[in-house]
Amino acid sequence: QDQVIKFTTEGATSQSYKQFIEALRQRLTGGLIHGIPVLPDPTTLQERNRYISVELSNSDTESIEAGIDVSNAYVVAYRAGNRSYFLRDAPTSASRYLFTGTQQYSLRFNGSYIDLERLARQTRQQIPLGLQALRHAISFLQSGTDDQEIARTLIVIIQMASEAARYRFISYRVGVSIRTNTAFQPDAAMISLENNWDNLSGGVQQSVQDTFPNAVTLRSVNNQPVIVDSLTHQSVAVLALMLFVCNPPNANQSPLLIRSIVEKSKICSSRYEPTVRIGGRNGMCVDVYDDGYHNGNRIIAWKCKDRLEENQLWTLKSDKTIRSNGKCLTTEGYAPGNYVMIYDCTSAVAEATYWEIWDNGTIINPKSALVLSAESSSMGGTLTVQTNEYLMRQGWRTGNNTSPFVTSISGYSDLCMQAQGSNVWLAYCDNNKKEQQWALYTDGSIRSVQNTNNCLTSKDHKQGSPIVLMACSNGWASQRWLFRNDGSIYNLHDDMVMDVKRSDPSLKEIILHPYHGKPNQIWLTLF
């Protein structure tokens, strides 16, 4: 057992809590998949390294320890003085490695929310979280024996430690509640994230051509569905830590792993071939013109239909072809400006039918190294292949739900991004303010809900350029943004991120700046 990770409620600030959560995440991280931290692969985890403990205290004399299973970041036991209590579903090895010098007892319920809520006689939505709740939990668990109250306090600790380690959205909510000294109850968005952690983790790790095997339905804070079916979906950036599900096929295996371990390790299936829409510029869909499947018919951008229809549905085949109604998305040639057509897969030149969909929403033809592009901003424009410049008109997102993800965006000092005419700056967050609502489109643009013809745009391609609202019809590289799991909002073309100028919101300026990861470059979608 190395250093115990500690958090004390005494003199706690949102900063001390943030440091605690970051230390916990670091201890739990086993690697990266698609750039997102993931828990260790259980097959490579030795039992003696499987558990860690976290010390939670109110003072020098009042503290408990929570035992966490590294393979799922879950609380499996707690220690109070020289007694320890294990949840009924704790792995058998837990008591061999956790709190060994204590008298060990088994609780008569397991750690699932279903069981805990049943015993607590309250749902998660009814149980307030925050510093006060954590103080009470620590002092009660020190000596309390009432099952109902144990269950209730464990619900508090699990969410403020385990769930917060898993999600930036949840650690943010707790941080704000500590800073403002107000309790909060989990909303629909938070509950849906907690309930879908394994689904989201699996979606990311099993993704094929940037696409989840199954859509994951989250909820927004006002309980509207948020359907996530692509790695490029902007909500994926709230994941701080994934459950290990499987290694992506042909992932570069670390040479340090012993062969036998790698063979035992679970590899994701590569057989999966999703059929999805492909949303792009202005939220339009890749569409076979006029439903015509004759060879050479052009592919256009058209508004996504209300119903899923064949000429907007594409199967992402494992042979790297993209097919509608059995025919292949095919480039007419390998020169910039060549048009993209539907063609019989067997008679087309094979290389002209191969596409790779990158994690950043780029669809590229490997032979020509040209990318799928919607040069026209109007409906019905023919799609072509062009030199890759990471333009907004070259950004795509797969999935059957191509509607924009509408959310507020919080940043430095927990302030929210706000549109003001053609400017954008930070203001106190207010869910009811239209000017703080942003529509995140399939093309990577960020648009003010007040006028979705206006996109967040960096004025220039150089460090320090202000970010303002400009017409989306330009389809520029300076209008395409990627929400990354490190919290940055990243511009692919410029390799820079959104930055609150000099960490001073009173300057009322958000600028383009190289990434350094300080708080003035960290953003979060608030659902």
UniProtKB/Swiss-Prot annotation:
Keyword Repeat among record annotations: yes
Signal peptide positions on this chain: none
Pfam families hit by this protein: Ricin_B_lectin (PF00652), RIP (PF00161)
Cystine bridges: C246-C268, C285-C304, C328-C345, C416-C429, C455-C472
Active site: E163
1-gamma repeat copies, ranges: 368-400
PROSITE patterns: RICIN_B_LECTIN, SHIGA_RICIN
GO MF terms, alphabetically ordered: carbohydrate binding; rRNA N-glycosylase activity; toxin activity
Catalytic activity: Endohydrolysis of the N-glycosidic bond at one specific adenosine on the 28S rRNA
Modified residues (Pyrrolidone carboxylic acid): Q1
First and last residues of every 1-beta repeat: 325-365
Ranges of residues in domain Ricin B-type lectin: 272-399, 402-526
Residue spans crossing the bilayer: none
Keywords: Disulfide bond, Glycoprotein, Hydrolase, Lectin, Plant defense, Protein synthesis inhibitor, Pyrrolidone carboxylic acid, Repeat, Toxin
InterPro entries: Ribosome-inact_prot_sf (IPR036041), Ribosome_inactivat_1/2 (IPR017989), Ribosome_inactivat_prot (IPR001574), Ribosome_inactivat_prot_CS (IPR017988), Ribosome_inactivat_prot_sub1 (IPR016138), Ribosome_inactivat_prot_sub2 (IPR016139), Ricin_B-like_lectins (IPR035992), Ricin_B_lectin (IPR000772)
2-gamma repeat segments: 494-527
Enzyme Commission number(s) from the entry: 3.2.2.22
Glycosylation sites: N110, N360, N400
Leading EC class: hydrolase
Family to which the UniProt record says this protein belongs: In the N-terminal section; belongs to the ribosome-inactivating protein family. Type 2 RIP subfamily.
Subunit structure: Disulfide-linked dimer of A and B chains.
Domain notes: The B chain is composed of two domains, each domain consists of 3 homologous subdomains (alpha, beta, gamma).
Role noted for this protein: The A chain is responsible for inhibiting protein synthesis through the catalytic inactivation of 60S ribosomal subunits by removing adenine from position 4,324 of 28S rRNA. Abrin-a is more toxic than ricin.
Name the record gives this protein: Abrin-b
Source organism of this protein record: Abrus precatorius (Indian licorice)
